[in-house]
């Protein structure tokens, strides 16, 4: 890699930058504003799950499964979760692990 060409989304104007590498930080800022106060977030807007809820919900925390949020039956995984690694492979792994917790929660509810 020798460089990149950046294009302004609105004007189309291009700007070239010499560089030896490019690092994408998708997920560096969580897009959680739409959640409102439906689940607990940290001060940066990342979703709190399972162990991070200790002391915030009392007895409810003991019931939280891995990747479960402050709202029973609602799960979060990947970059949007507080304490996640912010890497694609880790997010994929968390997603598949969260599915197991979803199945466990559904089994408890039926």
Can you describe what each PLM-predicted range is?
Residues 1-61, 104-110:
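A Rossmann-like FAD-binding core segment of flavoenzymes
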Residues 60-72, 77-110:
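A conserved FAD-binding loop/helix module that cradles the flavin
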């Amino acid at each position: 890699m020798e460089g990149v060409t950046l294009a302004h989304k609105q004007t189309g104007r291009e700007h070239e930058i010499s560089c030896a590498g490019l690092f994408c930080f998708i997920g560096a800022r969580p897009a959680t504003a739409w959640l409102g106060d439906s689940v607990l977030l940290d001060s940066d807007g990342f979703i709190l799950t399972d162990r991070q809820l200790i002391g915030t919900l009392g007895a409810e925390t003991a019931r939280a499964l891995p990747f479960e949020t402050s709202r029973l039956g609602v799960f979060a995984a990947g970059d949007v979760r507080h304490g996640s690694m912010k890497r694609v492979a880790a997010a994929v792994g968390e997603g598949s692990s969260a599915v197991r917790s979803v199945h466990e929660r559904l089994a408890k509810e039926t």
